Structure formats: structure tokens, C-alpha cells
Design a protein with these regions (language model features):
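P-loop NTPase nucleotide-binding/switch module
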Residues: 130-150
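Hydrophobic anchor at the beta1->P-loop junction of P-loop NTPases
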Residues: 155
Length: 172
């Protein structure tokens, strides 16, 4: 995972009211550090070059329809490949019913499997927007903003050195 800010998977599950289809012990404490989400359409065909395992994976109607045309053995092979990468979570959109091979593979690899009733594109854009805010770098500064002759001036300094008192004295 990256070195920047992180967010617990449990927070995302609660925020988006995701249904937990399978969650190994401690799954709520998994840390998410990547602001992007992947739709593993190419991976469902067997292409895993340049696959970013640190992203959450979102399966929608397109991926599900493709898998429906595959045999149970092919589905098992694809899900085994996907879950073997140990991504933070796999989310099924549109309230789609998981294939038995999907559940079996999630348990086999102790992978988190979630579901939302939301439309795939809407959920993806909302989740990415949320992750962008939650995982944005932040910085804390001690300071007070004062107006001097109509211009804003930021007085910065260590905590407790009298910035606010200086501001109050300038008002008097």
C-alpha cells in the first residue's frame, strides 16, 4: 500500500451501506490507500498484465454478462486469478447475485466480497469522489487570519505563542 493517508475498509462499507457477502477475520481493518477503482473487464478474459492489485475491484453488468457465457470451470479460473492478487475488496454492483465460483474463490483466498444495489457507473463515480477527498493529503498549520487595511494576513507560528492575542490587540 502507498505511504499517504489511508481509510479503513469498514468505514467505506458503513458509508456506502455495502452488503458483506464474505469477509475474512479482520477485513474491516484493511487499509485503503489508492483513490482509484478498477473494473476488471480485461482480467475476466485472463489478461492480468499491468493489473493494479492495490485498487478495489468493481464488477458490473458487463463483466457479469461476459462471465455468464463462460463455463463454470472458466469462471472458477478467472475468479481464482482475480482473488489470488489479494486486492483490498471486490464489489459486485447492481445487486447481482454472485456466481457460486465467485463465492468459493473469495473464501479460498480470504478475499473480501461486497455488494451494492447501486448502478455500476454511479457507484464507481461516487466511490472515487469519496476516496479522493478521504485520501487527499492534509496539512495542519497553527495560525490566525487578520485583516490589515483590507488585505488578509495570515499570522503563523507554534501553538501558544500569542497569535490570537496579537490579533485581538490589533482590533483595539
Amino acid at each position: 500500500m502507498g505511504k499517504g493517508p489511508t481509510i479503513r475498509l469498514g468505514t467505506i462499507i458503513d458509508q456506502f451501506h455495502l452488503e458483506v457477502l464474505y469477509g475474512p477475520e479482520g477485513y474491516r481493518d484493511r487499509q485503503i490507500s489508492i483513490q482509484d477503482v478498477n473494473r476488471p473487464g480485461l482480467q475476466m478474459t485472463g489478461y492480468f498484465d499491468y493489473f493494479d492489485r492495490e485498487r478495489m475491484q468493481l464488477l458490473g453488468l458487463v463483466e457479469w454478462s461476459y462471465l455468464q457465457e463462460r463455463t463454470a470451470e472458466e469462471r472458477m479460473e478467472r475468479f481464482d486469478q482475480l482473488f489470488s492478487y489479494h486486492t483490498p475488496a471486490v464489489i459486485i454492483a447492481r445487486g447481482l447475485e454472485p456466481y457460486p465460483e465467485c463465492m468459493e474463490s473469495a473464501k479460498k483466498y480470504d478475499q473480501v466480497l461486497l455488494r451494492t444495489k447501486e448502478n455500476t457507473a454511479d457507484f464507481m463515480s461516487t466511490l472515487i469522489a469519496y476516496l479522493r477527498v478521504a485520501l487527499s493529503p492534509t496539512i495542519t498549520r497553527h495560525g490566525v487570519l487578520v485583516e490589515v487595511y483590507g488585505e488578509g494576513v495570515l499570522l503563523m507560528g507554534e501553538s501558544g505563542v500569542g497569535k490570537s492575542e496579537t490579533d485581538r490587540k490589533s482590533v483595539v
